[in-house]
Amino acid sequence: MNTAELSRVCRQVRRDIINMTANAGSGHPGGSLSAVELMVSVFYNHMRVDPQNPKAENRDRFVLSKGHAAPCYYGVLAKVPGIDASTGSLGQGCSIAVGMALGAKLQGKDTKVFAMLGDGECQEGQIWEALMSAAHYKLDNLTVMVDNNGLQIDGSNNEVMSLGDLAAK
């Protein structure tokens, strides 16, 4: 998909986010809006998915660990259906994605797993345990993305608990 088409999809997803959160009278539009470009790019340019066959066995998988970005995810899913996992508390999605990637690798499948995390949830120890497992098992079929927007529900990350140089970690 070219840049103009991606921009059009991003604008529509942003409209969907605002409509969903406004109509619900609830939600976290900021955390969804900060994830739009990354999620749209992954679904439309990097993942192997077929909207006509969303349960295809050989499709790639996506795990949204950053649950506050669910309205963004729903906006993307309107055109590219298929939820591979529902996550609970922040930090659990990374472990789920590692398990999916390891399972695919052990079964010899050509499946890639993509996980989107929020930078605030990277303060959770479970994230780092999952990432150590991914490195140990050499999960080259796993892509973990962090929406590094500098904010979480309690304030700025630096005020709550600085992550330091996240890219270096």
What is each of the regions a protein language model found here?
Residues 49-55, 59-61, 80-169:
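Glycine-rich ThDP/TPP pyrophosphate-binding loop and its adjacent helix/strand module
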Residues 72-79:
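Alpha-helical support elements that line or immediately flank enzyme active sites
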Residues 1-70:
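N-terminal amphipathic, basic-rich helices that act as targeting or association modules
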